């Protein structure tokens, strides 16, 4: 299997269909979709199954361990993450990534650009540097190079930091690709990570 797409979800029945639909509409079909439902009390899990996702219910109350569980379940050669209120911009995202992987067989991580939306305003983020570098959903990872790297169990919004610290310490080959593939909603109250200003907090440890 080429790709595993991991979505951590928390009471996402009102918005997750757009995320799931952007995956199911992909022209490249060699993938699996994994939705890990963290402490959900609504219909998130049943909706995910409607879209062909493998699902698992957990009670971590934190984004990091939920993503870690997705990594444990994943079987694809390459890993992608998506938040439950975000989506891919095109139906050919996986097709483009597969082509880029074939063109760059040495790459361990492929970083791509994204659209950043906050308070109703959306703008493209074209260079992945500074605080935007540390965001797990704007990258595609070779699974056998992730190894033991895992997200933190913190609820402060810095769960990505130890994951990337471990990845960087491996001396992996990173390809920075200026191609927007992802639509990122910066804030939605009630999400697992409470996106707001916490998503990038603590990332200075790596910069």
Label for each model-derived stretch:
Residues 11-25:
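Short, well-formed alpha-helical segments that are part of the catalytic scaffolds
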Residues 22, 29, 36-46, 83, ...:
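A conserved acidic beta->alpha catalytic loop
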Residues 15-17, 42-50:
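Acidic helix N-cap motif at the loop->helix transition within catalytic regions
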Residues 1-4, 22, 32, 162:
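Cell-envelope/extracellular polymer assembly enzymes that use nucleotide-activated donors
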Residues 58-74:
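Glycine-rich, basic loop-to-helix element that forms the pyrophosphate-binding segment
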Residues 112, 124-201:
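Conserved nucleotide-sugar donor-binding catalytic segment
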Residues 87, 91-124:
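Conserved donor NDP-sugar-binding/catalytic core segment of glycosyltransferases
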Residues 79:
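Short aromatic/hydrophobic "clamp" motif used to bind/position activated sugar donors
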């Amino acid at each position: 299997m080429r790709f595993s797409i991991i979505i951590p979800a928390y009471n996402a029945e009102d918005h997750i269909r757009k995320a799931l639909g952007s995956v199911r509409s992909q022209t490249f079909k060699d993938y699996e979709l994994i939705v890990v439902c963290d402490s959900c009390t609504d219909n998130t899990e049943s909706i995910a199954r409607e879209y062909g996702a493998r699902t698992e219910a957990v009670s971590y109350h934190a984004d990091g361990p939920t993503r870690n569980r997705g990594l444990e379940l994943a079987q694809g050669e390459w890993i992608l993450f998506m938040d439950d209120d975000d989506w891919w911009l095109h139906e050919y995202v996986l097709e483009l990534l597969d082509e880029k992987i074939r063109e760059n067989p040495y790459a361990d991580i492929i970083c791509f650009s994204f659209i950043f939306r906050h308070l109703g305003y959306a703008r493209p983020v074209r260079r992945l540097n500074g605080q935007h570098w540390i965001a797990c959903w704007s990258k595609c990872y070779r699974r056998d190079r992730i190894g033991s790297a895992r997200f933190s169990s913190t609820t402060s919004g810095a769960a990505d930091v130890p994951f990337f610290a471990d990845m960087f310490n491996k001396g992996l080959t990173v390809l920075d690709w200026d191609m927007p593939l992802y639509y990122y909603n910066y804030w939605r109250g009630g999400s697992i990570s409470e996106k707001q200003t916490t998503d990038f907090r603590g990332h200075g440890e790596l910069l």
